[in-house]
Amino acid sequence: MPPQGKTPLSAVLTEHGITVLLVDDQAIVAAAVKRMLETETDISFHYCQDPNQALQKALEVSPTVILQDLVMPDIDGLTLVKFFRAHPRLKNIPLIVLSTREEAATKAEAFALGANDYLVKLPDRIELIARIRYHSAGYINLLQRNEAYEALMESRQALASELALAADYVISLLPQPITAGSIQTRWRYFPSTQLGGDCFGYHWIDEDHFAMYLLDVCGHGVGAALLSVSALNVLRAQSLRNTDFRIPDRVLASLNDAFQMQDHNDLYFTIWYGVFNRTTREIRYASGGHPPALLITGAGQTSQLITPNFFIGGMPDSTYESGAVSVPNGPARLYIFSDGAYEVDKSGGAMWTLEELQAYLLPNPPDEAQEIDGLYRFLQGMRGQATLDDDFSMLKVSFIG
């Protein structure tokens, strides 16, 4: 049973009846064929005596099969076959050639020019009706297949527009980069063609505590994007009840209580959430099924910040742990990202790894403003495609001095 609110494709396809067009200069033949078909109430019969009007008549009646005489005045029957096959609206209609003679060479030429069948007139009634039904069924299937394909393309275009609007909405919610002060941020978000559920943000909780977070909802599409936006708004507004947003493990536990899968269309999300204390220069963090954040100091030391927690929404009674790391004096960089930033198939088939991403980010970037863009271009070149299979999201937090 189709989901509520959705119409099955079979219900929107056009029902086509069987329509026969006979092209023959002899009215007696037309009368005979009409008599053969008169008891077949589901077959509509049309007759064209003038071969010069055959194409126009076919355009008017839209036959599902054409019966065409081979020997007619003014136009040779084989030439008329060429005309039918050259017309863009008529070229696929099944065409049965009628002839008074059984000639192998003529048959071969007719088939070579595009005829679908060959009958010596007049055939037995049962045989004629069987061939009409057989060829019409094939053509009707072709029409409905083409119609279904067009409907699918329209649906895909509508979905693409919907996803583009959703992506624009997600981007509009992301915070402005911080370009001055002791904490600075840069980020890039490149949605995939299917639009995943990536979202991120940062804000000052109070004068000393700076929150940073990135989440990734499972799956793709508008549903995933809406859930990520809901979670983002909760974090930005700090609207989880009885939760100290300076304590990451409590934040994840409260998110898990608020966003259980059974209440959100079986969707869950992973998250990395951290809080920097600018007085102590300590980052407290917790991750729920999410890739580690990478902390790179000015001395080139790298730390993977990750905790062994379950993703958000999977189990109601999950407990969460947090970790802590000190940021030494001097410049340091923290990279928070989704798995789309490194789980990228190379053109040769292997997948890029977290360790390779870490090695890529380790050197001080020659142009910090273009660092994340440069990474994305690198992944595009490695993948061999302009768009990656998953959302690419990366947030860089720089600690100055």
Which residue stretches match the model-derived regions?
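Two-component/phosphorelay signaling modules centered on CheY-like receiver
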Residues: 13-19, 27-46
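Active-site residues of response regulator receiver
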Residues: 24, 69, 99
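Active-site beta3 strand of CheY-like receiver
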Residues: 61-67, 71-72
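The feature encodes the CheY-like receiver
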Residues: 73, 82, 91, 99, ...
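… and, occasionally, acidic/histidine-rich disordered N-termini of signaling adaptors
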Residues: 148-335, 384-401
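C-terminal catalytic subdomain
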Residues: 328-335, 341-401
